[in-house]
From Swiss-Prot:
Ribonucleoprotein recorded as keyword: no
Family: Belongs to the RNase PH family.
Binding site for phosphate: R86, G124, T125, R126
Broad class of enzyme this protein falls into: transferase
A Gene Ontology biological process term: tRNA processing
Species annotation: Psychrobacter sp. (strain PRwf-1)
A GO molecular function held by the record: tRNA binding
Protein's recorded name: Ribonuclease PH
Name of the gene this protein is made from: rph
Function: Phosphorolytic 3'-5' exoribonuclease that plays an important role in tRNA 3'-end maturation. Removes nucleotide residues following the 3'-CCA terminus of tRNAs; can also add nucleotides to the ends of RNA molecules by using nucleoside diphosphates as substrates, but this may not be physiologically important. Probably plays a role in initiation of 16S rRNA degradation (leading to ribosome degradation) during starvation.
Gene3D superfamilies in alphabetical order: GHMP Kinase, N-terminal domain
Subunit structure: Homohexameric ring arranged as a trimer of dimers.
Amino acid sequence: MRIDNRELDQLRTVTFERNYTKHAEGSVLVCFGDTKVLCTASVEAGVPRWLKGKGQGWVTAEYGMLPRATNTRNQREAARGKQSGRTQEIQRLIGRSLRAMVDLTKLGENTIYLDCDVLQADGGTRTASITGAAIALIDALEVLQQKKKLKADPLIGLVAAVSVGVKNGEVLLDLNYEEDSSCDTDLNVVMTQKGEFIEIQGTAEEKPFTRAEADKMLAMAEKGIADLVKLQQTALGW
């Protein structure tokens, strides 16, 4: 039994509240336990310069944390004048993951920005961001279709993400902050709804992990992501 009385392979309570804000084409408040992230999808006509004239669109992401999302206040990155390496890494991960959902050649010369703002952090902010932003992206695509801006549906399928870790020889799913900060090893795994891997980020924090442990972590992540996809589908009314 874990710190919060979950089973080893049990997700935290996961919820999605769609249409959380009124201006964005898609907006979702996603909660993984006490981690809460507001994910908004904004559509803008046009694409980055390096894509102009190629007849395709673009999906990108930005990520940030509110100053008091954590136990002590952090200065806003805008006030510091630059983004941290962590922020840049996470928003690139989110963008890569969400581009796997869309056939960019069917998006037209439109850009969809996914903004993921962490309201409260208790571990797994990047995985919650990906999982919530996937729903916001689908809602934004629906708006484009309703406005007759697309000739064909560009959606390929859902993606979701979850963390796994090894602590005292046991594999744990969906780590909260206390678990994440004390694990021997942790992975962040992103997959499609078909069970294909998009990204695997893994680090041995305290001691190296074996191939057998890696296989166990990936198997547990696969199960967790399948459960997350079902929750996404329920939230979407599919």
